[in-house]
Amino acid sequence: MTTGRHTATELDPTLDDYQLASALVREAGQLALLMRMGGLEGERKTSVSDVVTAADHAAEAYVMEQLRRCRPEDGILGEEGASVSGTSGRTWVIDPVDGTYNFLHGSTYWCSAIALKHDDGTDAGQRTVDPSVVLGAIYQPELDKLWLGGQERAATLNGEPISGPSAASVAGICAATYIHPTWLADPRTAMPWHAAAVSAASLRMFGSGSCDLGRVADGELGCWFQHSCPEWDWLPGKAIVRAAGGETAVVQVNGMNWFVAGGPTAVRELSAALTSVPQFA
């Protein structure tokens, strides 16, 4: 496949799902990086920090094309609009560039991510908040880090086993998180976020949920929480954290879903902190 002057690899349909996921995020990430080196401009989506570039679209188009060749019976769901209904009961969920604001401004903290999920809880068009996920792959091109894991394969970083999330209490570890500044003006989100944030030893806010979750899985970051995550921001990392021996949860507070990942103790404590605040009618 050629996108402008950038050529990406045609993948082998005989690859197993884990091999295919790894190849897709690696190729998509390298394609995006090459396009950035050639110069890009961002287009605003919902806010000044929520942007999209031609690289996002090109990387998603590449992944979609390869999946339609290699897994024609599977569904596809992408952040930038890709949507294909499948017949297999499985759907690939694509985030071609997670952390586009970072990507556009020259940071290395961005990635390409993909998950394969079961199509459970989708009757009558109703999609479950936290579907069952088969596998996830996350690739951070500028650091050449590839996390992979799923139901049938323990989590790895660049092919090597990882130690898994911290078993410590939140009070003794750092918590990675993200919240847009405007949400801090709304007590429905500000109060639970604050309750969880102050329970941690330290906070990290880097701007790429999938990069964060890969680091929770390998123990570099202690735990993670964020609200209102779409599937492409949640499922790749969820699969890898669970494949590393960690836990994940989704809790609802004031009509908002909060997504939590880490070791069992941290997930339990963060969930309790988030739900400890007053409930608004």
Model-derived features: where do they sit?
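Acidic active-site catalytic centers that drive phospho-/nucleotidyl reactions
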Residues: 56, 79, 95-98, 102, ...
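N-terminal subdomain of lithium-sensitive/metallo-dependent phosphomonoesterases centered on the IMPase/IPPase/PAP
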Residues: 1-97
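An extended, acidic
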Residues: 163-281
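DPxDG-like acidic metal-binding loop motif
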Residues: 86-153
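Residue-level signal for inorganic ion chemistry
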Residues: 32, 56, 67, 100, ...
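Short acidic/glycine-enriched loop/turn segments that link adjacent beta-strands
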Residues: 48, 143, 254-256
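A short, compositionally biased
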Residues: 39, 149-153, 254-255
